[in-house]
Regions:
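Generic alpha-helical structural signal
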Residues: 14, 55, 91-95, 108
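A ligand-binding cleft/hinge motif common to bilobed small-molecule-binding domains
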Residues: 11-17, 38-41, 45-75
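Bilobed "Venus flytrap"/periplasmic-binding protein-like clamshell domains
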Residues: 1-34, 51-55
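Ligand-binding clefts/hinges and TM-proximal coupling segments of bilobed small-molecule sensing domains
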Residues: 8-17, 65-66, 99-145
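Second-shell loop/turn segments in exported
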Residues: 3, 40-44, 96
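Solvent-exposed, acidic/flexible segments
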Residues: 2-6, 28-32, 47, 84-87, ...
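Periplasmic-binding protein-like
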Residues: 51, 59-95, 117-140
Length: 146
């Protein structure tokens, strides 16, 4: 199993290994490209990483259709936006904008454009369907994270 040094995947795989009393042979790599090469060249059976990042990595392979992302996960790690803690006016603008984009369907269209459709100039399609966590946040917007 390939795991890129410095990522949260390192801690997740170690926690999983300990919780399930397993001995997983994992290869630490310097970057995503090296991890992908280990799997592509059959020197590793798997690559542990955020699903959306894996989708991007796989999409760049000439034989992308030979790889898949499992539905199972080692944990949930929400992405977020950061801005100054004491900037309530800016937070209000961000909240209003995001909620408006969700209500109008614009955010769903953007998601489809970038994750489910061919992306110029190479017309690569990540084929990355919206997961249940993202669907829930679109249905019930919150600044609390997942």
């Amino acid at each position: 199993t390939a795991v890129t040094s410095g990522t949260t995947s390192v801690a997740l795989i170690k926690e999983f290994e300990k919780a399930h009393n397993l001995k997983i042979r994992y290869l630490m790599t310097k970057d995503f490209a090296e991890s992908m090469q280990l799997v592509a060249n059959k020197r590793a059976d798997a690559f542990i990483l955020d699903d959306v990042l894996l989708a991007g990595q796989i999409s760049n392979l000439p034989n992308a259709s030979e790889f898949t992302i499992l539905d199972a996960s080692l944990g949930v790690e929400p992405y977020g936006a950061m801005f100054r803690k004491d900037d309530a006016p800016f937070k209000a603008v961000v909240d209003k904008t995001v909620k408006g984009m969700i209500a109008s369907g614009e955010l769903s269209k953007l998601y489809s454009t970038w994750f489910e459709s061919p992306i110029p100039p190479k017309n690569i399609n990540l084929n990355f369907k919206m997961n249940s966590y993202t669907k829930e946040l679109f249905a019930n917007p919150s600044d609390k994270g997942i």
